[in-house]
Amino acid sequence: MSLSTNRPLPALALLLSLAGVATPAAADLALATSKNCMSCHAVDRKVLGPAFKDIAAKYKDNKGATDLLATKIIKGGAGVWGPVPMPANTQVSEADAKKLAAWVLSTK
């Protein structure tokens, strides 16, 4: 089998090399899954806790929302979304909490 020179092999090679690269949104979803956020939350529907898109809508005009939510991720909270409290997640680092908070706020 011979390869003709008119085939787009460089483009194909590039596409194949990018196939294994995760998008930032997928990476942040993986982080949320690994930190057990998805046990109580979903992106687009209420589970035990509110949907991430609802959280994003609620805090869309809050300039300090990323830090506020990062603190809630680590320390927990109650009373904002009803009677069920969010437990503390002390195993989540501050950097990961901020990354998760920024991702949650980016959901639509």
Give the ranges of each region predicted by the language model.
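Axial heme c-ligation environment in periplasmic c-type cytochrome domains
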Residues: 39, 48-59, 72-101
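Short hydrophobic/aromatic patches at helix-to-coil boundaries
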Residues: 30, 104-108
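Bacterial N-terminal signal peptides that target proteins for export
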Residues: 2-12
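Short microdomains enriched in Cys/His and/or Lys/Arg
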Residues: 58-68
